[in-house]
Amino acid sequence: MIRILQMAVILLSVPMIVIAFYSHPSVDDYGYGSSVHLWIQEHGYHVFGIIKCAAEFAYEYYFKWASSYLDSFTGALMPENFGCYWISALMIYFLLTGGMLYLFQSMAVSLGGKEYRWIGTVCALTGIVAVTQNWPSSAEALYWFDGAQSYMGYHAVSLWMCSALVMYMFCGDKKRSIRLLVVSCVLVFLAGGGNNVTSFMDVLICCFFLGCAVLLKKKWGIVFPLIVSIAGFLLELLAPGTAVRGGGDYN
């Protein structure tokens, strides 16, 4: 069964990977990537300068238009600025499928033990086939960088976040629990910076795990990812750019 599903995923992935090499920038890609593009033309490929330029662009957009505190930053680093637009689709695809695989395996191992890892693998591969063959628009999901990274990219980060939270809830080693808690907080912050929907979902997910902690009467450290998720959501909700995009005034 696993081999059949593995072959199905590989065969179904080939066309999507090939198409990635024919994708090209469009619409918001130019708006978000223009500042870094101009900086590279003037100063060349200097890593810290490019990061600084992208951060300045994100800061400006946070107050003027886009409330997401990380989306504008990653959008400014459009791969076409570096001559490799095709890599964006591959990064998002493997980040998403890897997140699904890791999440289901984490659940299977945490609930049943390592001997049940294969169940998680089967569920993940089945889910990957279902998702990749049924999304409304593969162009927006993978091949349009700005839209894909804003939604699918940060959704994929949420999957990795859920994996870390699952492993934390079932981890019996204190030191490993602390490491998983730190990783969870980092991933919660990153996932929440993509868009309002993902940010709010992260709050709900952390609330669910807090409910599990209440039932189990342990793992109260889950409060820290919850606090981070709420802080991230408020960063987006209360951003000046939110009022601008929603029709408010900006002075």
For each feature predicted by the language model, list its residue ranges.
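Membrane-interfacial entry segments at the cytosolic side of transmembrane helices
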Residues: 1-2, 116-117, 175-180, 215-228
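Start-transfer (signal-anchor) and selected internal transmembrane alpha helices
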Residues: 1-16, 117-120
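Transmembrane catalytic cores of multi-pass membrane glycosyltransferases
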Residues: 18-86, 92, 145, 196-251
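Structural signal for the C-terminal ends of transmembrane alpha-helices
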Residues: 20, 103-112, 134, 163-173, ...
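Membrane-embedded alpha-helical segments of multi-pass membrane proteins
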Residues: 70, 91-99, 148-161, 203-204
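Transmembrane-helix motifs of polytopic, lipid-linked glycan transferases
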Residues: 91-122, 160
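Membrane-interface micro-motifs in multi-pass membrane enzymes
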Residues: 118-169, 195
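Membrane-interface alpha helices of multi-pass inner-membrane proteins
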Residues: 179-196, 202
